[in-house]
Amino acid sequence: MAPAPTPAAAAGRRVAVLAAALVAASLAASVGVANAAVSYDRRSLVINGRRRILLSGSIHYPRSTPEMWPGLIQKAKDGGLDVIQTYVFWNGHEPVQGQYYFSDRYDLVRFVKLVKQAGLYVHLRIGPYVCAEWNFGGFPVWLKYVPGVSFRTDNGPFKAEMQKFVEKIVSMMKSEGLFEWQGGPIIMSQVENEFGPMESVGGSGAKPYANWAAKMAVGTNTGVPWVMCKQDDAPDPVINTCNGFYCDYFSPNKNYKPSMWTEAWTGWFTSFGGGVPHRPVEDLAFAVARFIQKGGSFVNYYMYHGGTNFGRTAGGPFIATSYDYDAPIDEFGLLRQPKWGHLRDLHRAIKQAEPVLVSADPTIESIGSYEKAYVFKAKNGACAAFLSNYHMNTAVKVRFNGQQYNLPAWSISILPDCKTAVFNTATVKEPTLMPKMNPVVRFAWQSYSEDTNSLSDSAFTKDGLVEQLSMTWDKSDYLWYTTYVNIGTNDLRSGQSPQLTVYSAGHSMQVFVNGKSYGSVYGGYDNPKLTYNGRVKMWQGSNKISILSSAVGLPNVGNHFENWNVGVLGPVTLSSLNGGTKDLSHQKWTYQVGLKGETLGLHTVTGSSAVEWGGPGGYQPLTWHKAFFNAPAGNDPVALDMGSMGKGQLWVNGHHVGRYWSYKASGGCGGCSYAGTYHEDKCRSNCGDLSQRWYHVPRSWLKPGGNLLVVLEEYGGDLAGVSLATRTT
């Protein structure tokens, strides 16, 4: 029998109970109904009066196609998930201020309704900042140019636009009857995203902004709880949640809120020039079991299906087009085994113990030097236990409840009845399946070269250098910087070619002088800035310098997005002249947004007939290539092998596949043990090889015959190496 509580302890409990009651009342008031269909207490979310252990997975609707959605959702359900989590992508839905788009891959309502049809719930992360390795963190670029705007702080113009979008999404979900109290699948919403770490560098406006965001969100009366991830000071009734590789250390900021893990990272993203990360499923399962055994009640796998950064949606900069993330369902929609199957078995074990887990707190017993037992006992006598071995190298035999159990290193066994071990996180029974790429189509090419000497009617001239994004508004990756330099008789007397130096904020740059290419330079994920230094041949009189600056995705992490820059910011100098060095930064420059081929729409069937195409262009830079092909037989996923090419973009039947880049991964790829703390540089592959070789082409984009493939090659490559392949396991 437990000792009677002291008066102080009893008073403390009364305060905690009263606080919980006040939060429950606040939540019910925000719901706008007498009894909230979805509420929470300190153990878990409560749905229609029932506490739940909820297993969730992230599937981002724009990173796959509507035709893929039903299959992905069903595979998530078959894998034992209860919830599908997705961000809402502001820049996809409001590409132009006040003009909204909710069709095709951005048909959010259709996606949510498909989840409902499958019998699953939805966690809708409205944000609208998403990070997500998504272009500009999900913010529309036009927001950067709203007068007086300052991002993610206590700023009137920013808050007005953010509130307008959040209310737009909430209103749309309500009008479609998609919140749980309306009979829909949405049980939870999120405002902002990982803002807590920004508060320390965000200045005096950071905390007021976070509080405003929470109050604004609750005021929309969604009828479901709101969360803020990585926001330790999230105000009531908002729940603060954890993101990370591990979250067993986490506790919510109030003892009447449940412990929730909104991003359990199943792997990591790939950047151009980086290795390909892999997270062993034994460690992932171990991390999830650790969280549950310590009272966690909501786990979301980020990502459960990563998908593809189609078009120019990848952020970073330098985030790859593949967003596979080593997820249980791979980029192409196929099961990644053994990860998918092992997690399914974990979920079954957790669900067997769910009634006990949500009704009792664990007691902790030491059963060895590195071993512990977390035991849950319900009032009705039901019992569940988690037996844990934290040693990274040694398997052990332990005794619990009079029985002996084998515990591999770095593992947890789950006993739903405190007797039978039905699952161990390090014991993988599912076979490993290695996917194969099967080349099935080669191409007959035609080519068209960009004219680097011509300027369109939209070009304009201005004194000095300008920031690229302020000109392009991200309508194109490309901006031409063109100027003229007069070389006098005495400037070239030494016989040595002048040295051109160009400083750029990123991300890639090509230099042409008098129409001749003088090479390219580019930055990387860790340092997007770059410098061009090269000897260029010039003649007496007027010389034309053309610099093509290329963006490779806009930053997705930070707070003051209004301060991000890209493009040639200077200085630009010409040296090794007899007259010394010329600073070209402040003279007249002519600017042109985009390439001629983009303006003509060469990536479309109609636009491709606007120019005269010739034979294959080989290794020429800034060249468009096109080919027609028939779709491979069957239904296997399809991918393009671009490993023989340089850098550029791809379209199939006018659909923008994305950026491609044969950028080799730097750094080392050592051995990989599942045991021990995981981080993003552990268990990498492809070091010294291409970060990405294969590019997903959704089947729904193909027709039986006469498909048009268009390639924009910036540097030059070997067209003979390009092929279309099917992916099988």
UniProtKB/Swiss-Prot annotation:
It is found in: Secreted, Extracellular space, Apoplast. Its main location: secreted. It comes from the Eukaryota. Its EC number is 3.2.1.23. The active site is at E194 (proton donor), E263 (nucleophile). Belongs to the glycosyl hydrolase 35 family. This is Beta-galactosidase 4. It comes from Oryza sativa subsp. japonica (Rice).
